């Protein structure tokens, strides 16, 4: 599911809200989550999972085409850890 599909589905399930209203709400939620991650925080959605930022150190990489060694700079990447309820629902039939 992509963001536009989520917005359309939420608007259909909540006829008292327009699609524009749902779009604004989803946009604000995502912006707040991104803002929290930018500030070095963590976003936890109980039962679903937690988003945080992890640091990747600088390292030596290799260009697969030429074999040349290149320096890869240190960077921050988003990290998702699934919640217990989500894992349980995904593995319910096993």
Curated annotation (Swiss-Prot):
Keywords: DNA recombination, DNA-binding, Transcription, Transcription regulation, Translation regulation
Top-level taxon of origin: Bacteria
UniProt keyword annotation of Transmembrane present: no
Assembly description: Heterodimer of an alpha and a beta chain.
Gene3D superfamilies: IHF-like DNA-binding proteins (4.10.520.10)
Pfam families associated with the record: Bac_DNA_binding (PF00216)
GO terms for MF: DNA binding; structural constituent of chromatin
One GO-annotated biological process of the protein: regulation of DNA-templated transcription
Name assigned to this protein: Integration host factor subunit beta
Family: Belongs to the bacterial histone-like protein family.
Function: This protein is one of the two subunits of integration host factor, a specific DNA-binding protein that functions in genetic recombination as well as in transcriptional and translational control.
An example Gene Ontology CC term for this record: cytosol
